[in-house]
Amino acid sequence: MSEAKNLLAQGLWKNNSALVQLLGLCPLLAVSSTATNALGLGLATTLVLVCTNTAVSALRRWVPSEIRIPIYVMIIASVVSTVQMLINAYAFGLYQSLGIFIPLIVTNCIVIGRAEAYAAKNPVGLSALDGFAMGMGATCALFVLGALREILGNGTLFDGADMLLGSWATVLRIDILHLDTPFLLAMLPPGAFIGLGLLLAGKYVIDEKMKARKANTRVSVPQLQDGDAEKAL
């Protein structure tokens, strides 16, 4: 149980693939123009991570170390192709919106990194949990960045949610800011870099406050000197 909690804590916050390791920045910055796109790519990446880690862990005893990387890439490519076809079949609007960034999951350093660093050395269950935690950590970062850019750029949230969840999801669209003209900087690549910088700064501030709180609550027990110990006796 402690190992599972540690994996969740590492993937979601302490070793977040997007905000700590800074992996997968290309899709993180390019696709996060809306919350829907960010959530769609994040969930697709999470599914790929879980399936890839499970397959690599299950086959780890039979994969020669000399050719493990090409085999891992083949496994990742097969899983990504399957996910791409599923999105094409059941969420075609999202498939068109994400475009080339779905097949580019194959080259995402998060996927191959977790396969090599964790799944190849650990049991199937923990490897699947590691993939889920890392994927959800990246998804949360993508979603927050996408929501921030969409709100500042268009004044809306969950615009186009029907592309991901179906026609019923049109009711999820929320008009937060009533803008006469869109704030283009938030929607362009410079806005993505600025938003990512704000997220990194926010995480740093939260981490520092958590460290300070732990330091303040830590109880220090003073050590008795030899003379004090004799008097006590």
From Swiss-Prot:
It is an enzyme of class 7 (translocase). The chain crosses the membrane at residues 18-38, 39-59, 69-89, 92-112, 128-148, 182-202. One of its GO terms (cellular component) is plasma membrane. It is found in: Cell inner membrane. Belongs to the NqrDE/RnfAE family. Its EC number is 7.-.-.-. The complex is composed of six subunits: RnfA, RnfB, RnfC, RnfD, RnfE and RnfG. HAMAP family: RsxE_RnfE (MF_00478). NCBIfam families: PRK12405.1, rnfE. It is a multi-pass membrane protein. This is Ion-translocating oxidoreductase complex subunit E. It comes from Yersinia pestis. PANTHER family: ELECTRON TRANSPORT COMPLEX PROTEIN RNFE (PTHR30586), ION-TRANSLOCATING OXIDOREDUCTASE COMPLEX SUBUNIT E (PTHR30586:SF0). The keyword Transferase does not apply. Part of a membrane-bound complex that couples electron transfer with translocation of ions across the membrane.
